[in-house]
Amino acid sequence: LKAPGHERFFQSPMLEATFGGGEANVAISLANYGMDAEFLTVLPKNDIAECCIRELRYFGVDTKKIVRSEGRMGIYYLEGGANQLPSKVVYDRAYSSIALAKPGDIDWDKAFEGVDWFHITGITPAISESAMELSLEAVKEAKKRNITVSCDLNYRKNLWKYGKKASEVMRELAKYVDVAIANEEDVQKSLEITVDVNVESGELDRKKYKALGNKVLESYPNMKCIAITLRESHSADWNGWAACLND
């Protein structure tokens, strides 16, 4: 739910509703490129979840393997930044269906039937301890079936609230990852691999990113490559983007 334009929360009495999420965005992008994409998650048995499923189908994403269970839809509230006013996000993910999901809730033989690539992000294991355990089960089950695993580390400090540090979880999950996607802050906070850059400054020292990628690959020999995104922030709504690939 987003405040209209660049307004503050409830500056006007409305919020714009859209469906999204780290893994869902990837599935939709792949479908838009003409690739076969399936989405696996746990959603509640209500009309809001049905709207979400219809949205995924609209973009060509296969939703047949989505599990329906108790709980609610997770929500996040977004206040879009402008100039020197930063964006603001408020998460409301507790007791969502995926937050309540636990190991054993998904039939992995069915979920991974016909699958050759599994993508996950660091957001899912951050939602709850049971979702973290389910995420670890997922990557282990994928590797048992020789499925390529990719992971966008996607560190979100405001989600890690259940007593475990992101690095405690993500360093274990990374052992099962073939392709990693991250920025320098993700690497520092999720893998505890440090680099000599100031991630808060918004400025890029491009010479250091090859060394950073190599350091990750040396630490995780199971990884075949890592893509590192580079963002140079001029203001809240003006950013320069680039990426590099280490293999």
Regions found by a protein language model. Name each.
Residues 36-122:
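Conserved N-terminal subdomain of the carbohydrate kinase-like
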Residues 25-36:
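Alpha-helix C-terminal capping segments
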Residues 1-8:
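Positively charged, low-complexity intrinsically disordered leader regions
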